[in-house]
């Protein structure tokens, strides 16, 4: 799906774009003989962050309200999150630059502030089963590892596929080069996970 990009908008606009697209897909299922019980969401990098939050909003009304977003009226059965940019306010390259563009200058004083931490219990506990993919050469590998720990602590069914050091397996490699052997392995493992939830 397409969504507006920062700095032309804030993250709340992006959440709305994703939620609206999900709603449109759900409403269009009958045209394509889709099964409303078998809807999964897959995204990478910043899109994985947006998908995670909008999906959590379907089960966490305070999050949706704080984000000024009307969430989809249905739940995704599971998520596939590839090289997710889950953390936006840490003391790192992302956290030092993005927060004021994403959330606005005074976001720490808003109702959304507690949710800027992707490990927020209300947020994480509202997620469906998650399949995570990363690699040692992914610059956001540590984000995936920390988010996987949060899923474990909140008893969210999940699976992590972490590829070893390999200079070809960089950030979101399975999206940028889906025909690599490792990309096929990741995609097939995600498919198998989806079949079991």
Give residue ranges: language-model regions.
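Alpha/beta-hydrolase superfamily serine-hydrolase fold, recognizing
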Residues: 1-197
């Amino acid at each position: 799906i397409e969504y507006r990009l920062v700095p032309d908008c804030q993250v709340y606009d992006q959440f709305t774009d994703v939620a609206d697209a999900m709603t449109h897909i759900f409403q269009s299922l009958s045209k394509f003989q889709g099964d409303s019980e078998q809807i999964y969401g897959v995204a990478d990098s910043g899109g994985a962050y947006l998908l995670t939050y909008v999906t959590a909003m379907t089960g966490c009304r305070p999050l949706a309200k704080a984000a000024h977003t009307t969430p989809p009226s249905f739940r995704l059965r599971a998520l596939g999150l590839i090289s997710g940019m889950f953390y936006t306010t840490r003391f790192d390259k992302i956290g030092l630059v993005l927060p004021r563009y994403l959330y606005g200058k005074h976001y720490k004083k808003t109702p959304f502030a507690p949710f800027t931490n992707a490990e927020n219990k209300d947020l994480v506990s509202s997620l469906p089963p998650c399949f995570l993919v990363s690699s040692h050469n992914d610059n956001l590998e540590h984000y995936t590892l920390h988010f996987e720990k949060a899923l474990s602590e909140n008893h969210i069914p999940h699976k992590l596929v972490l590829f070893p050091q390999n200079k070809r397996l960089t950030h979101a490699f399975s999206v940028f080069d889906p025909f690599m052997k490792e990309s096929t392995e990741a995609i097939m493992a995600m498919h198998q996970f989806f079949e079991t939830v």
